[in-house]
């Protein structure tokens, strides 16, 4: 749910500021990351005893000087009691910047670690197929198979040993 709301705010920022100023906006918003990482700051944002205006002012103090549209953005978030969405808005802005640059993250899930040469070959082949720049990261799990996901493009490719065996059994049973 938070992601959907953050996506709307990020989209509004992109429309208000334009694609060319996204990087500087993201940098400005990321100035609050350390504060959002503290429990005391989170408690202050969640506290019903502190006014929305004061919460907004505290966040603005953490962020420092910014242009009028960004200051108004923070005031709107404070007014709607959604200041805790700032880290999520940052993630959505990062995705938007990556999409304009045609850069995406792919996650390869396997049981065993692949060597760098194999990972690079997979990355290059997939990048060529998708006509995009990819950064491939590997994730190890207890999973008998291979799964490759590029979430932002909606691409998922998997091969599971268990599914292969089940499909083979069904095929043999249908043959008789």
From Swiss-Prot:
Bilayer topology: Peripheral membrane protein
Principal location class: membrane
Could you state one GO cellular component term attached to this entry?
Answer: plasma membrane
Q: Any idea which UniProt keywords this protein has?
A: ATP synthesis, Cell inner membrane, Cell membrane, CF(1), Hydrogen ion transport, Ion transport, Membrane, Transport
Instruction: Give the matching InterPro entries.
Output: ATP_synth_OSCP/delta_N_sf, ATPase_OSCP/dsu
Q: What GO molecular functions are on record for this protein?
A: proton-transporting ATP synthase activity, rotational mechanism
Query: According to its UniProt record, where is this protein located?
Result: Cell inner membrane
**Pfam families in the record:** OSCP (PF00213)
Q: Give TM segment ranges.
A: none
Q: How does it assemble?
A: F-type ATPases have 2 components, F(1) - the catalytic core - and F(0) - the membrane proton channel. F(1) has five subunits: alpha(3), beta(3), gamma(1), delta(1), epsilon(1). F(0) has three main subunits: a(1), b(2) and c(10-14). The alpha and beta chains form an alternating ring which encloses part of the gamma chain. F(1) is attached to F(0) by a central stalk formed by the gamma and epsilon chains, while a peripheral stalk is formed by the delta and b chains.
Query: What is this protein's function per UniProt?
Result: F(1)F(0) ATP synthase produces ATP from ADP in the presence of a proton or sodium gradient. F-type ATPases consist of two structural domains, F(1) containing the extramembraneous catalytic core and F(0) containing the membrane proton channel, linked together by a central stalk and a peripheral stalk. During catalysis, ATP synthesis in the catalytic domain of F(1) is coupled via a rotary mechanism of the central stalk subunits to proton translocation. This protein is part of the stalk that links CF(0) to CF(1). It either transmits conformational changes from CF(0) to CF(1) or is implicated in proton conduction.
Q: Family, per the entry?
A: Belongs to the ATPase delta chain family.
- What is the protein name for this chain? ATP synthase subunit delta
Give the source lineage, highest ranks first: Bacteria, Pseudomonadati, Campylobacterota, Epsilonproteobacteria, Campylobacterales
């Amino acid at each position: 749910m938070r992601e959907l709301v953050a996506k709307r705010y990020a989209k509004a920022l992109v429309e208000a500021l334009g694609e060319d100023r996204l990087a500087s906006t993201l940098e400005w918003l990321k100035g609050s990351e350390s504060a959002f990482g503290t429990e005391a700051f989170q408690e202050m944002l969640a506290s019903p005893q502190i006014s929305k205006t004061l919460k907004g002012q505290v966040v603005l103090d953490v962020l420092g000087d910014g242009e009028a549209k960004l200051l108004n953005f923070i005031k709107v978030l404070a007014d709607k009691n959604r200041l805790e969405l700032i880290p999520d808005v940052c993630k959505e802005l990062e995705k938007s910047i990556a999409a304009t640059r045609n850069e995406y993250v792919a996650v390869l899930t396997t049981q065993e670690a692949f060597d760098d040469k194999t990972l690079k070959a997979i990355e290059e082949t997939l990048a060529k197929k998708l006509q995009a720049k990819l950064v491939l990261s590997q994730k190890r799990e207890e999973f008998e198979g291979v799964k490759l996901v590029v979430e932002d493009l909606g691409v998922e490719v998997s091969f599971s040993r268990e599914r292969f065996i089940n499909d083979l059994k069904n095929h043999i049973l249908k043959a008789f």
